[in-house]
Amino acid sequence: MKTDTIAAIATGLSNAGISIVRISGDQAFAVIDKIFQTKSKAKRLSEMDSHTVHYGYIVDEEEIIDEVMVIIMRAPRSYTMEDSIEIDCHGGITVTKKVLEAVLKAGARIAEPGEFTKRAFLNGRIDLSQAEAVIDVIHANNELALKNSMKQLKGNVLHKVKDVRHSIILDTAYIEAALDDPEHISLEGFSDKLRDNVIGSIKELSELINTSENGRMIKEGIRTVILGRPNAGKSSLLNLMVGEERAIVTEIAGTTRDTIEETVFLNGLCLNLIDTAGIRETSDLVEKLGVEKSLKSAKEADLIICVIDASTPLNQDDKEILEFIKDRKAIVLLNKSDLDSVIEEEKINLLTNKPILKISAIDQTGIKDLEQTITEMFFEGNISFNDEIYITNMRHKNALVEAKVSLEQVIVSIENEMPEDFFSIDLMNAYEILGTIIGESVDEDLVNTIFKEFCMGK
């Protein structure tokens, strides 16, 4: 690991109130002493107590660059567990760059992307899953994603994985000890105990794996396709949910010929709304391509909102759409409830078992019922999180699945009365795989790949 002193701008480079230039490494105080000056020219910062804030100026050969506040943190009580300095300067682009240039001129080098967090990981302050949570916190685009990332940052995934690994290593150690010293340590009856322990570990891993689909939707949003025949009111519904005229609305059927995507936030959930071309038989080549794209989007959706014009009788297009959504997560909306309805809910019920709601995109009625129904369809209506952690990282999910497969092989070996050393092979394989999640058994290339995704200064 590189132990030289690094520096970078930790905030977005723009005209703002303040910017932060971060320094970390064993020469951090030597660097700041060269460029920081107080009005009274009092003691150097290297002589000050840790976790204190100091007012003064950043200078370059006696020329004042900026008026700043400097925070000093001595190792190991810092983010990187190294001597660290944070310079709060004015937020202009030019002045921030000049401050960084002074820091580099004084002996620091520019940090690589994610190098501060990488040092926090390599120095043992956080594990690899927590390091990955840092970037998830930064990129979180909704409240639930932020809450889940913070739980991971606090070590929830770490603790669950460590508990399973601890159980595995205890069983492995006992087997190895018994094989080395059979006169004093007996394996008689151990298979039953091992089976119970492994089944418990498989259950723990399965529970984590089963959260990954909801985890994906928390992180990326619920892919929600608005489907229906032309002029059913799909674009009006999109505009209503988005809160602005995002899609063109006319009385001419087939106005929307391509998908339109927008993101809305609903009770902490992120919905990626997709307005699609109306579904109908058509000879128009462009419209036909739009219909095909609509159906493709619907097949990939987490949720389909099927919009039916309640002011006109059901036609064959409506019936085919209802058949299409039969085995998918969907809601049926009877739109244009402001007009006289000619469709009976009982007839719709015969064609689908999906929730049916009345709505008027024009009068903006029924939207609250729609929002409540969507909330209830995901996370069992409970999105307060409590103590649950959702797996949002595909690397973590794949490792959990691989570890589970190895543990299931242990059960197979027990049932087939295989020699005990066979148990150890699969147990240790699961142990090592789980170690890749928290960084206890991971190669350098993977670590470097993960941290390259970070921004400069983090």
Swiss-Prot record:
<dbReference type="InterPro" id="IPR027266">
    <property type="entry name" value="TrmE/GcvT_dom1"/>
</dbReference>
<dbReference type="Pfam" id="PF12631">
    <property type="entry name" value="MnmE_helical"/>
</dbReference>
<dbReference type="GO" id="GO:0002098">
    <property type="term" value="P:tRNA wobble uridine modification"/>
</dbReference>
<keyword id="KW-0460">Magnesium</keyword>
<feature type="binding site">
    <location>
        <position position="250"/>
    </location>
    <ligand>
        <name>K(+)</name>
    </ligand>
</feature>
<keyword id="KW-0547">Nucleotide-binding</keyword>
<feature type="binding site">
    <location>
        <begin position="275"/>
        <end position="278"/>
    </location>
    <ligand>
        <name>GTP</name>
    </ligand>
</feature>
<feature type="binding site">
    <location>
        <position position="255"/>
    </location>
    <ligand>
        <name>K(+)</name>
    </ligand>
</feature>
<feature type="binding site">
    <location>
        <position position="231"/>
    </location>
    <ligand>
        <name>K(+)</name>
    </ligand>
</feature>
<dbReference type="InterPro" id="IPR027417">
    <property type="entry name" value="P-loop_NTPase"/>
</dbReference>
<dbReference type="InterPro" id="IPR004520">
    <property type="entry name" value="GTPase_MnmE"/>
</dbReference>
<keyword id="KW-0819">tRNA processing</keyword>
<dbReference type="InterPro" id="IPR031168">
    <property type="entry name" value="G_TrmE"/>
</dbReference>
<feature type="binding site">
    <location>
        <position position="22"/>
    </location>
    <ligand>
        <name>(6S)-5-formyl-5,6,7,8-tetrahydrofolate</name>
    </ligand>
</feature>
<dbReference type="GO" id="GO:0030488">
    <property type="term" value="P:tRNA methylation"/>
</dbReference>
<keyword id="KW-0342">GTP-binding</keyword>
<feature type="binding site">
    <location>
        <position position="235"/>
    </location>
    <ligand>
        <name>Mg(2+)</name>
    </ligand>
</feature>
<feature type="binding site">
    <location>
        <position position="458"/>
    </location>
    <ligand>
        <name>(6S)-5-formyl-5,6,7,8-tetrahydrofolate</name>
    </ligand>
</feature>
<comment type="function">
    <text>Exhibits a very high intrinsic GTPase hydrolysis rate. Involved in the addition of a carboxymethylaminomethyl (cmnm) group at the wobble position (U34) of certain tRNAs, forming tRNA-cmnm(5)s(2)U34.</text>
</comment>
<dbReference type="InterPro" id="IPR027368">
    <property type="entry name" value="MnmE_dom2"/>
</dbReference>
<feature type="binding site">
    <location>
        <position position="252"/>
    </location>
    <ligand>
        <name>K(+)</name>
    </ligand>
</feature>
<dbReference type="GO" id="GO:0005525">
    <property type="term" value="F:GTP binding"/>
</dbReference>
<feature type="binding site">
    <location>
        <begin position="250"/>
        <end position="256"/>
    </location>
    <ligand>
        <name>GTP</name>
    </ligand>
</feature>
<dbReference type="Pfam" id="PF01926">
    <property type="entry name" value="MMR_HSR1"/>
</dbReference>
<feature type="binding site">
    <location>
        <position position="125"/>
    </location>
    <ligand>
        <name>(6S)-5-formyl-5,6,7,8-tetrahydrofolate</name>
    </ligand>
</feature>
<comment type="similarity">
    <text>Belongs to the TRAFAC class TrmE-Era-EngA-EngB-Septin-like GTPase superfamily. TrmE GTPase family.</text>
</comment>
<protein>
    <recommendedName>
        <fullName>tRNA modification GTPase MnmE</fullName>
        <ecNumber>3.6.-.-</ecNumber>
    </recommendedName>
</protein>
<dbReference type="InterPro" id="IPR006073">
    <property type="entry name" value="GTP-bd"/>
</dbReference>
<dbReference type="Pfam" id="PF10396">
    <property type="entry name" value="TrmE_N"/>
</dbReference>
<dbReference type="GO" id="GO:0046872">
    <property type="term" value="F:metal ion binding"/>
</dbReference>
<dbReference type="InterPro" id="IPR005225">
    <property type="entry name" value="Small_GTP-bd"/>
</dbReference>
<dbReference type="GO" id="GO:0005829">
    <property type="term" value="C:cytosol"/>
</dbReference>
<keyword id="KW-0378">Hydrolase</keyword>
<dbReference type="GO" id="GO:0003924">
    <property type="term" value="F:GTPase activity"/>
</dbReference>
<feature type="binding site">
    <location>
        <begin position="231"/>
        <end position="236"/>
    </location>
    <ligand>
        <name>GTP</name>
    </ligand>
</feature>
<feature type="binding site">
    <location>
        <position position="86"/>
    </location>
    <ligand>
        <name>(6S)-5-formyl-5,6,7,8-tetrahydrofolate</name>
    </ligand>
</feature>
<keyword id="KW-0630">Potassium</keyword>
<keyword id="KW-0963">Cytoplasm</keyword>
<feature type="domain" description="TrmE-type G">
    <location>
        <begin position="221"/>
        <end position="379"/>
    </location>
</feature>
<dbReference type="InterPro" id="IPR018948">
    <property type="entry name" value="GTP-bd_TrmE_N"/>
</dbReference>
<feature type="binding site">
    <location>
        <position position="256"/>
    </location>
    <ligand>
        <name>Mg(2+)</name>
    </ligand>
</feature>
<dbReference type="InterPro" id="IPR025867">
    <property type="entry name" value="MnmE_helical"/>
</dbReference>
